[in-house]
Amino acid sequence: MALFPDLVPELKAAMPQLRGRLLGNEPLAPLTWFRVGGPAQVLFTPADADDLGYFLAALPRDIDVTVVGVGSNLIVRDGGLPGVVIRLGGRGFGETGTDGDVVSAGSAALDKRVAEAAAAAGLGGLEFYHGIPGTIGGALRMNAGANGRETKDVLIDASAIARDGTLHRLSNAEMGFSYRHSGADPALIFTSARFRGEPMDRAAIRARMDEVQRHRETAQPVREKTGGSTFKNPPGHSAWKLIDAAGCRGLRVGGAQVSEMHCNFLINTGSATAQDIETLGDTVRARVKEHCGIELQWEIKRIGRALD
C-alpha cells in the first residue's frame, strides 16, 4: 500500500519538457548505506543541471524538496519523505576533470573518485577525500574532512541551483564553512565544484591515498551497513573515546548496534529499522552526557518522518 498520494501524473503534465525520471512512492532504503527507511513520495533523478533548473522552476512552491546523494551519511526515517526527493547521478552530475592545478567535479562524483582524478593529474592536497564515503555534494554541504584536512581547505567555488531554478556560484568565503557544516542557504542544490590542487609527485600522492585507505579499512567497519561517523567530535575530544568511556561499545537497540571496531559508528546488523538506529544514537548521547557532561551532536543527517 502506498504511503503517499501519487503526485507523478500531475508533475509530468505540468513539465512537458522534463527529461529526468519521476517515480512515485519509491523505496529509499536501497539508496542508503544503512539500508533502512521509508519511501519518497516522489523520487526525481534529473538528466543534468538544466533539467534540474527546469524542474525546480516549475515545481509548486508548497511541495517540499530534499536532496540525497549516495546515502552514506544519512538515516531516512521509516515513514518516508513527503514531497520530492532529488537524487543527482549519472553523467550529468558525476563527471570529474582537471585543468592546470584546478580539479572540477560534479556534485554526484564520489569523493574517492575526485581524489583519484587529482592524483592522476599529479595534484595533491585532495588525498583526504579518498577515505570519505560520500559525494562532492555532501562534502560541500557538511564541509567533509578527514586526516586533518577539510573541504574548506581546497575549495575554490561551487555552483548551485536555487529553489526557483536560478543558477548561483558561491566562493569559498560565501560557503560559510565551519566544522562539519556549511552556512550556505539550505535550499541551494549543489551541482558542481572546483578545487585547488598542489603539484606533487604522483607516487607520493598515491602513497598517501593508500595510507588513508589502509587506515580506513583497519579502523572502521567498512564491510558493515553503516552511515559513517555518527557524531561530531566535540572540541578537544574524540567522540569514539567518549562513547567507549560511557560503556556503549557493542550496545544494541533492536537490530542496531554500536560497532565493536569503532564506537562512533552505528551498524545495521541485518534487521534494524531506522527507528532502532536513531533510538540507539539518542541512547548513546544520553549515556555520554550522563557520564561526562558532554552532549554529542549528530553528524549523520536524519530526514523524513517516523512511521505512524
UniProtKB/Swiss-Prot annotation:
Gene3D superfamilies: 3.30.465.10, UDP-N-acetylenolpyruvoylglucosamine reductase, C-terminal domain, Uridine Diphospho-n-acetylenolpyruvylglucosamine Reductase, domain 2. Belongs to the MurB family. Residues 35-200 form the FAD-binding PCMH-type domain. GO terms for biological process: cell division; cell wall organization; peptidoglycan biosynthetic process; regulation of cell shape. Pathway: Cell wall biogenesis; peptidoglycan biosynthesis. Its cofactor is FAD. Residues 211-236 are annotated as: Disordered. SUPFAM superfamilies: FAD-binding/transporter-associated domain-like (SSF56176), Uridine diphospho-N-Acetylenolpyruvylglucosamine reductase, MurB, C-terminal domain (SSF56194). The keyword Flavoprotein applies. The active site is at R180, S229 (proton donor), E299. GO terms for molecular function: FAD binding; UDP-N-acetylmuramate dehydrogenase activity. Keywords: Cell cycle, Cell division, Cell shape, Cell wall biogenesis/degradation, Cytoplasm, FAD, Flavoprotein, NADP, Oxidoreductase, Peptidoglycan synthesis. Cell wall formation. Signal peptide: none annotated. InterPro entries: FAD-bd_PCMH (IPR016166), FAD-bd_PCMH-like_sf (IPR036318), FAD-bd_PCMH_sub1 (IPR016167), FAD-bd_PCMH_sub2 (IPR016169), MurB (IPR003170), MurB_C (IPR011601), MurB_C_sf (IPR036635), Oxid_FAD_bind_N (IPR006094). Its EC number is 1.3.1.98. It is found in: Cytoplasm. It comes from the Bacteria. GO terms for cellular component: cytosol. This is UDP-N-acetylenolpyruvoylglucosamine reductase. Residues 211-226 have a biased composition (Basic and acidic residues). The gene is murB. The lineage of its organism: Bacteria, Pseudomonadati, Pseudomonadota, Alphaproteobacteria, Hyphomicrobiales.
